[in-house]
Each structure stands twice: as structure tokens, then as C-alpha cells.
């Protein structure tokens, strides 16, 4: 069990855990399902049990779709994989599922590259670009933890991005390489070391870190690749495993004695020695054929280039069992025929697993597009002798291949696209929100006076301490509008595509805190913009047909005001297009259904009160009060500190902030930054950023 979810938290209310017959999941239910949730859950569970391959959960923003997914998974008791369209959304889902399943294996499988430049060749300029990348250690560990959980247990929920349809090592070979140690096993020190090296662990006596081991006499310490804060000590006596202990690699303190331990390979690309030798032979055969082809065509430069590069890789494979760019030879290792799909994370899933595609209208497009882009780049590398043709088989899955590997699927979206509507056996509607909030009122106004009209609407909203989102069609329009509003005294920011994830999170946070009141953007469909304080969404030039003014985009954008009791959407247009008509009709239909439900149940809509720290919706946190109390105590503590102590505390917070950022916990990082600002203000009388300017 990997330690990032084995911490069964003590502060959870035992009575809130729910279990279902025959299911290994323990669902933490802070509140019972309400609104449309119970029917949606029952429909989906029944559909899966009846053997439906595809179903859709049509859930509006703020209706608690994640909660419905968690309930469905818990009731079915099968391993599940939840796909998200990007890392930010995946991180959000991962955090939510960990809240719902604190005692089960919730895993995270996204691309481990912080930065990635694939190798490529530009023939026009004779320019070869080497592969260059920086791997995020922490995410690599979580990926290894995900495949390990799938092999060991059934109560697994994996949150993944499209990264899951890219090739990784073959599951059966990965399985063959596992080393299980039990007390009393007959195994010598040299054999343990040989097995570890075959699994791509490195021996390192000085720097003991993930994926390394160290030897002291008959004691071997192993730092498993899928763990972040736990290592295992194997003590041998007379070629037999005497004892096994788990210990803290940082302090060396022994945690517990254990009867057995399974060491998993340190990479998904490990292969048994005989497979490597077999691959070396088939690579040589392919190289010979390819060189003959180049010589026949008189392409001598390409032939020489290919031979030099491949021979070097072959030597590395024979000596070490792996080489740089080993994934380009994956077909030779798996023994697959040319053109066959590569093994991916999907192959590690058991046959009865459940697949949930969140924001499926975006995901299906992504899954469709991955293969073509990859293919175009690799064909150049092959044609010009940088790679063997078999490199073309190290690729993401084509969509039809992914379809063949799909298990039972639930598409989740507020606006399902044509594909989902075509293949779904049934659709579960989740239109009613547990909070009683209804979809915003829609008004269409003339586009000719849109800018002045928006300004007067903003003034009203600012008085009521509410926020406004405005979506326009072009960068130029966005810049001009931002400038115009700023000149009229409106606190406004412009959100454009060049802003990175961390800064986006900060801008959204500042909007919620009221640092500014209006956010102008072009594409407001991106994640994280479900902001309860927003009571008005203005769509300028709503009648210009195009991707951002299509029916689905309009419904999604209008939905951005659905978390506020006074939510309203203004569409500025001189004529009503078909897309507008359909979007307005659908929103009105949902609104009518919601109002009818509220009247029947006697519910008064209440706004969502979200702590500013959460981008994560729908999870009520009992530690809210505790956090506020702690903050007040912190402030009091700072008052009593000497300057030296404060300097120390600043150092500590800076490190903490960097750690949070490294672990992709941008929200916490931003919070720590606010604490730092508080402290610096105490010392310097003003928050001077990161440096102190020389005063007198």
C-alpha cells in the first residue's frame, strides 16, 4: 500500500463511512446523496450491471458529479479509472476522490514531464533536435504506485490524463520482474543485488534516494521506487531472509517489522535479460534491412547516421539492459507485430474495470488527435535515418484501438458531444443541484451598445460585492475592453492563453478575494472558473458563429454564473443564431426542472460558500473553523517573535512554499505566500517582495 493514501486520518467521523455488499470500497459520505444524485447513481449502477458498454452522466456545473462518480464506483466495487482532460483538473479530481475514499488506493497517473521537448528533425534546415526533458520525481513515483496498486488490489481509483494511452512497459514482463521477499526465504546477498540491478535500481552508498539500494555486510536497504517516505531493510543470515523492517529513510528510524515485502521495478520499461537479448537480435535484423534500403537509394548520410546511433544503443542494451530512448524499441521488447498497438496503462486494468471520462466532450477530441501529431514527427526521424521504422510503433493509441480496449464506460459532461450521444445506451440526467441553485436567467441585448451596457451592469454588481466574467472573441478586443473598463475606474484583469497554471490559480483566487471585480477572457471554458462569487456572465458578440459561440460552448459559458443565487447571463447579439436558440432552450429547460424541484421540496436556493483556498468543489470541510483558529494563533505568535526568530520562520515558509509548488499544490503554495507577506510586513513595515531595498 503506498503511503500517500494509507494514512487513515483520525479526524474523520466513523459514522460517515459507508460500505456496500461485495465491494472493497469504504466511501466517506459527509452528506447523503440529494437532488438528482440518487436517481443518477441508481441508473448508472443498474446500467453497468446490465452490461451496457456506454452510458452518459449529463451533469450540470455544481451538481456534484464527482460525488456521483464516487458513489457509483463504491457501489459497483470494481477498480476504476477516471480520465480528465488536463493536469489541473486531474489534480482537482484526485484531491476529491481522496476525500471520498481515504482508506482505499486513490492513484494519480499523468505525464511525469515538467518540461518535454521530443526529438524531431526539420529537413528544410537540416536541424536535428535532441530529446530534452525534465522528469518530476514525485509524479514518476505516483505512476509506479498506480500500476503497483492495480496489481495488488481491487479497491483502486486511478485519476489519469491522456498520458494513459501512451506506451509504457508490458504488464506481463513488468510482473515477471517483481521481487517478493518473505522471512525465511532462501536467497543470497548476491542474488538480491542482481535482481535489484535487473529492475533498474542503482547501488548508491552515499545518497540514499528513490530507486536506489545500499549494502552493508548482510544488510540491504532498498528505497522502493513507488514510495516517497518509506524504505525497507532486508537482513540476511546464512543465505536466508532473517528479518524485514520498514524504516524512515530520512531519520533511519525503524517503523515496523513485516513478514513479507514486494519490490516493484523502478521503471515501467524493465525487461528480463532474455527478452533484452532477443530484442537485440531483432533490432540487428531490422537495422540490416534498413541499411540495405538506404544504400539502394543512395542515401549514404542517412545510412551512416542510423548505423552509428543504433549500434551505440545496442551496446548499451547488451551491457546495461537499457539505453536512452529505449521506448523507441518497445516493439522489439514486447514481440508485437509491426503496426500493433503498444502496451499502455489501459492494459494493466482488469477486464471488469470501470472507465469514467470526465468532461468527455473535450476528452474524446483529445484521444482522437494524439496519434496523428505523433506520427508526423516520427516519420521525419525515420525517413532521415535518426530512428528505425519500428520507432513508429512507440506511439499513443489510435482512437479505434482505444475503443477496442475500453471497458464499461461512463461519459461525464454538462454538454455531451455527438460521439457520446451516438454510442450511449442510456443517459442519466443530473440537472438539479443539492444546493437548490438554478441555472442563470438569460437575456439577449443588442450588440451595438454592448460595451456601455456592460459597464452599467458591472457597476451594479460591484456595489453588491459580486464578480463579473466577460468573454470576447479576440485578443485585441479583450485588451481594448480591459483598457476601457480600467479608464472608468473598474478593477479589471485580462486572462489570456500565455498565463501559466500557477498564475491562473492566483488570478482566480484574487478575483474571489475581491482584489479585482471583473475578469475578461476569450476562452472562459477552461477549468477552475466555477466561482461562486460570479453573478454575471456577459457574452459579447454572441451571434458570431464559431467554436466559442457554438451551442456547447455557450451552455458551458452561461453555466459559469450558476453558482450564485443572483446568477444571470447576458448575450449581446443583433440576431439570434441557431446555436443561441438551442443553448437558451436547453438552459431554460434545466432551469424549469430545477425550479419545479425546489418548489416541490420546499428548498430555498442558497449560494455556495467556498473557502477561498479550495478550487475543489463539492467537498464540505469540517476543519474550516480549525484552520481559521490556527491562522489567528499564527498571527498572535508572530507578534511575540524576535527578529531572528522571524527570519528563521521566513526561511521555513519559503521552503514550504517551494515544496507545495513542487507537489503541484498551487493553492497551498499561494496560501503560504500570503503568510510570508504577513511576516515580511511585520519585519519591514511593508511587504517588499523578495528583497529588501537599501534604506538609510
Swiss-Prot record:
Q: Where is the Helicase C-terminal domain?
A: 450-616
A Pfam family for this UniProt protein? ResIII
> What residues bind ATP, as annotated?
59-66
| Cystine crosslinks | none
Q: What is its main location?
A: cytoplasm
Q: Where in the cell is it found?
A: Cytoplasm
Which parts of the sequence form the motif Beta-hairpin? 112-135
Q: Which residues form the UVR domain?
A: 647-682
Q: Where is the Helicase ATP-binding domain?
A: 46-433
- Mind listing the GO molecular function terms for this protein? ATP binding; ATP hydrolysis activity; DNA binding; excinuclease ABC activity
Which biological process annotations from GO are given for this protein? Answer: nucleotide-excision repair; SOS response
Q: Which InterPro entries match?
A: Helicase/UvrB_N, Helicase_ATP-bd, Helicase_C-like, P-loop_NTPase, UVR_dom, UVR_dom_sf, UvrB, UvrB_inter
> From which residue to which does any coiled coil extend?
none
Q: Can you list the GO cellular component terms from the UniProt entry?
A: cytoplasm; excinuclease repair complex
- Keywords, alphabetical: ATP-binding, Cytoplasm, DNA damage, DNA excision, DNA repair, Excision nuclease, Nucleotide-binding, SOS response
The domain comment in this protein's record states: The beta-hairpin motif is involved in DNA binding.
UniProt family annotation: Belongs to the UvrB family.
Q: Which HAMAP family does the protein's record reference?
A: UvrB (MF_00204)
Which PANTHER family would you find in this protein's record? UVRABC SYSTEM PROTEIN B (PTHR24029:SF0)
Q: State the protein's purpose.
A: The UvrABC repair system catalyzes the recognition and processing of DNA lesions. A damage recognition complex composed of 2 UvrA and 2 UvrB subunits scans DNA for abnormalities. Upon binding of the UvrA(2)B(2) complex to a putative damaged site, the DNA wraps around one UvrB monomer. DNA wrap is dependent on ATP binding by UvrB and probably causes local melting of the DNA helix, facilitating insertion of UvrB beta-hairpin between the DNA strands. Then UvrB probes one DNA strand for the presence of a lesion.
Describe the protein's quaternary organization and the partners it interacts with.
Forms a heterotetramer with UvrA during the search for lesions. Interacts with UvrC in an incision complex.
What is this protein called in UniProt?
UvrABC system protein B
- This chain is encoded by the gene named uvrB
Amino acid at each position: 500500500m503506498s503511503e500517500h493514501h494509507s494514512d487513515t486520518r483520525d479526524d474523520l467521523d466513523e459514522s460517515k463511512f459507508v460500505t456496500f455488499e461485495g465491494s472493497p470500497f469504504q466511501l466517506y459520505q459527509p452528506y447523503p446523496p440529494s437532488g438528482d444524485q440518487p436517481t443518477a447513481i441508481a441508473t448508472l449502477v443498474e446500467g453497468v450491471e446490465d452490461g451496457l458498454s456506454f452510458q452518459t452522466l449529463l451533469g450540470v456545473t455544481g451538481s456534484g458529479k464527482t460525488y456521483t462518480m464516487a458513489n457509483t464506483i463504491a457501489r459497483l466495487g470494481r477498480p476504476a479509472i477516471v480520465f480528465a482532460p488536463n493536469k489541473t483538473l486531474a489534480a482537482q479530481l484526485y484531491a476529491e476522490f481522496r476525500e471520498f475514499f481515504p482508506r482505499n488506493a486513490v492513484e494519480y497517473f499523468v505525464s511525469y514531464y515538467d518540461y518535454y521537448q521530443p526529438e524531431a528533425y526539420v529537413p528544410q534546415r537540416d536541424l536535428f533536435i535532441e530529446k530534452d526533458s525534465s522528469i518530476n520525481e514525485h509524479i514518476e513515483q505516483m505512476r509506479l504506485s498506480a500500476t503497483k496498486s492495480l496489481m495488488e488490489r481491487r479497491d483502486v481509483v486511478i485519476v489519469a490524463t491522456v498520458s494513459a494511452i501512451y506506451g509504457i512497459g508490458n504488464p506481463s514482463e513488468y510482473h515477471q520482474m517483481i521481487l517478493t521477499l518473505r522471512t525465511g526465504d532462501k536467497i543470497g546477498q548476491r542474488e538480491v543485488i542482481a535482481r535489484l540491478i535487473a529492475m533498474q535500481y542503482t547501488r548508491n552508498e552515499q545518497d540514499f534516494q528513490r530507486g536506489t539500494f545500499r549494502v552493508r555486510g548482510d544488510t540491504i536497504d532498498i528505497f522502493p521506487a513507488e514510495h516517497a517516505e518509506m524504505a525497507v531493510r532486508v537482513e540476511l543470515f546464512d543465505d536466508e531472509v532473517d528479518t524485514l523492517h520498514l524504516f524512515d529513510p530520512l531519520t533511519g528510524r525503524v517503523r515496523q517489522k513485516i513478514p513479507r515485502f514486494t519490490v516493484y521495478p523502478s521503471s515501467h520499461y524493465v525487461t528480463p535479460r532474455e527478452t533484452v537479448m532477443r530484442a537485440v537480435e531483432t533490432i540487428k535484423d531490422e537495422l540490416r534491412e534498413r541499411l540495405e534500403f538506404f544504400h539502394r537509394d543512395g542515401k549514404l548520410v542517412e545510412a551512416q547516421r542510423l548505423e552509428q546511433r543504433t549500434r551505440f544503443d545496442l551496446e548499451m542494451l547488451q551491457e546495461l539492459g537499457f539505453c536512452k530512448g529505449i521506448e523507441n524499441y518497445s516493439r522489439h521488447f514486447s514481440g508485437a507485430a509491426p503496426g500493433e498497438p503498444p502496451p499502455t496503462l489501459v492494459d494493466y486494468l482488469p477486464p471488469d474495470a470501470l472507465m469514467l471520462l470526465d468532461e468527455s466532450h473535450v476528452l474524446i477530441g483529445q484521444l482522437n488527435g494524439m496519434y496523428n501529431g505523433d506520427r508526423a514527427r516520427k516519420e521525419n526521424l525515420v525517413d532521415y535515418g535518426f530512428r528505425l521504422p519500428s520507432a513508429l510503433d512507440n506511439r499513443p493509441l489510435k482512437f479505434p484501438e482505444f475503443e477496442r480496449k475500453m471497458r464499461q464506460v461512463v461519459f461525464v459532461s454538462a454538454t455531451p458531444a455527438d460521439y457520446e450521444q451516438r454510442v450511449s445506451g442510456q443517459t442519466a440526467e443530473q440537472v438539479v443541484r443539492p444546493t437548490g441553485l438554478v441555472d442563470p436567467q438569460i437575456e439577449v441585448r443588442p450588440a451595438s451598445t454592448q460595451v456601455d451596457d456592460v459597464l452599467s451592469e458591472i457597476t451594479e454588481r460591484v456595489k453588491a460585492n459580486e464578480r463579473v466574467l466577460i468573454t470576447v472573441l479576440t485578443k485585441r478586443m479583450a485588451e481594448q475592453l480591459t483598457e476601457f473598463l480600467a479608464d472608468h475606474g473598474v478593477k479589471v484583469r485580462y486572462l489570456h492563453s500565455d498565463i501559466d497554471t500557477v498564475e491562473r490559480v492566483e488570478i482566480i483566487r484574487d478575483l474571489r478575494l475581491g482584489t479585482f471585480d471583473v475578469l475578461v477572457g476569450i476562452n472562459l471554458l477552461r477549468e477552475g472558473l466555477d466561482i461562486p462569487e460570479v453573478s454575471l456572465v456577459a457574452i459579447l458578440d454572441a451571434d458570431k458563429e464559431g467554436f466559442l459561440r457554438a451551442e456547447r460552448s455557450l451552455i458551458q459559458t452561461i453555466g459559469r454564473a450558476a453558482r450564485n443565487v443572483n446568477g444571470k447571463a447576458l448575450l449581446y447579439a443583433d440576431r439570434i443564431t441557431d446555436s443561441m436558440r438551442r443553448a437558451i432552450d436547453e438552459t431554460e429547460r434545466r432551469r424549469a426542472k430545477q425550479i419545479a424541484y425546489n418548489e416541490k421540496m420546499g428548498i430555498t436556493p442558497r449560494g455556495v460558500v467556498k473557502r477561498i483556498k479550495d478550487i475543489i468543489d463539492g467537498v464540505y470541510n469540517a476543519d474550516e473553523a480549525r484552520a481559521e483558529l490556527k491562522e489567528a494563533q499564527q498571527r498572535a505568535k508572530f507578534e511575540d517573535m524576535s527578529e531572528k526568530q522571524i527570519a528563521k520562520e521566513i526561511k521555513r515558509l519559503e521552503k514550504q512554499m517551494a515544496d507545495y509548488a513542487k507537489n503541484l499544490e498551487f493553492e497551498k503554495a499561494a496560501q503560504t505566500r500570503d503568510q510570508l507577506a504577513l511576516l515580511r510586513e511585520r519585519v519591514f513595515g511593508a511587504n517588499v517582495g523578495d528583497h529588501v531595498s537599501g534604506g538609510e
